[in-house]
């Protein structure tokens, strides 16, 4: 009787341990997916801010060129 109870207890603990491992792997998958989503949202916000010129306002810079320059560059507003 004691042996049967002991065997059932050991089997039960094994099943619980397996289900804990399965839950852990599912949680890791969810956290990995959330991390990817957050990363992509951050990239989108970063690109969006550059497209619409938030850097120009935030850093006090303008996008333009001097007469002697061939291309356009970022300049400090103090250089005008």
Swiss-Prot record:
Keywords: Amidation, Antibiotic, Antimicrobial, Secreted, Signal
GO biological process: defense response to bacterium
Taxonomy, superkingdom: Eukaryota
Major localisation: secreted
Phenylalanine amide found at: 52
Entries under InterPro entries matching the protein: Clavanin
Cell compartments where the protein resides: Secreted
Stretch forming the signal peptide: 1-19
Protein name as catalogued: Clavanin-C
Protein source organism: Styela clava (Sea squirt)
């Amino acid at each position: 009787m004691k042996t049967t109870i002991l065997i059932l207890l050991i089997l039960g603990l094994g099943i619980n341990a397996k289900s804990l491992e399965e839950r852990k792997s599912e949680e890791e998958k969810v956290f990995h997916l959330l991390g990817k989503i957050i990363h992509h949202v951050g990239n989108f916000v970063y690109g969006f801010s550059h497209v619409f010129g938030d850097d120009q306002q935030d850093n006090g810079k303008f996008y333009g060129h001097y007469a002697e320059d061939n291309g356009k560059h970022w300049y400090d507003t103090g250089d005008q």
